[in-house]
Amino acid sequence: MAAVLMVHAAVAQADTTADTIAPDDHGAYLSVAFGNGRIYGGNASGYRWMRGRTFEVRAGRQQDEVFGLALPSGWTMRVDFVHYNEGHPDNNHRDGFALQWLAVHRFSPMWTGELGAGPYLSMNTTEIATPTGNTQIDDARLGVLLSAGLRLAVPGPSGTHVRLGYNHVAMHTVHRSDALVLGIGRQFGAAEPAPDVVPDGRLWLGGTFGTSITNMAGTHGAHAGVLEARQYAERWGIGYKFLFEGDDGARVDRRGLAGQLWYVQPVTPRLSMSAGLGPYVAANRRDGNRTATNLLISFQAERALSARTRAIVNFNRIKTFRKTNDRDLFQIGLLRRF
């Protein structure tokens, strides 16, 4: 949550250059919302409400055409990268990442509606019965996230609004969920990196430091560090990371090398959001140095401090797909151009 709050603070203090540009014109979209909901069906048991700990973070890009075809007046389309947490009902703590396509309709200068759908890769920390007793697992599944939203424009920078959202998760053989969330968002105008801070073509080196949390009981948080090399090419980037995840005292003390493909969305001339995905090969010292290939998913905010320096804050999810030892890293650091 620290990473979420830092990103939200960065947005609130972002450059005002984009304010003079009309929103909904290929600009970035950012929102954060909190709420409550309920699970049902499948493996749902015990107390099924989410205990008021539901939240979502959205980062997207608005489009006014689909496959080169202009949309009707008042309509736009948006593609969102979503981190969604379904709260804490009994024996189920599910969260994950979705890629959503949304149809957006402006009813009036004050009111805007949204409908969206897309694949949702989830990770559920739960206990299952085994011959030796109950065993805690990280259950990875692919489902669908369906969303509807109603936005009300509020005073502030252009595009700022309050957003009331409804989310439905459908997933085969396991529980489904419904939730209402309320938060604040902003549709930014079109933006490109300022000429003096365009990152393309150069090699960037840097490091981040923060904490890591193993998504299993009986562990504690640890200090974690990452060394990174990256190159940008307009909206895309390629990065390589060496991760030191830290020792949780019981299950995980991993370190290894990851490669990621990034999509970069400018928010203002000096602020951008990006999402990265790629393989992560690591050895776990608490498992006899056994080496395995995992998936590294990252969500990052970058602020250009100068032509050669960028401040970054990110959230990283390490997914093992072995039903155990998934991990979250929250990091802050710097990239330097060479």
Where are these regions (language model features)?
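Sequence/structural signature of outer-membrane beta-barrel proteins
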Residues: G35-A44, D80-D90, Y120-A129, N167-T173, ...
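Residues that define the transmembrane beta-barrel architecture of outer-membrane proteins
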Residues: H26, W49-V57, N91-L99, A140-L146, ...
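Residue-level signature of outer-membrane beta-barrel architecture
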Residues: A59-Q63, A103-H105, L152-V154, H168, ...
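Short glycine/proline- and aromatic-enriched beta-strand/turn motifs that initiate or cap beta-hairpins
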Residues: A12-T76, D80-E86, S177-G237, K241-F244, ...
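Outer membrane beta-barrel transmembrane domains
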Residues: Y120-A140, V144-L145, G149-R151, G249, ...
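Repeated loop/turn-to-beta-strand initiation elements of outer-membrane beta-barrel proteins
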Residues: E65-M77, P109-G113, V154-L164, A190-P195, ...
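N-terminal signal peptide c-region/cleavage motif recognized by signal peptidases
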Residues: V7-A9
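Extended, hydrophobic interaction surfaces within ordered domains
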Residues: W49-R53, R58, E65, S73, ...
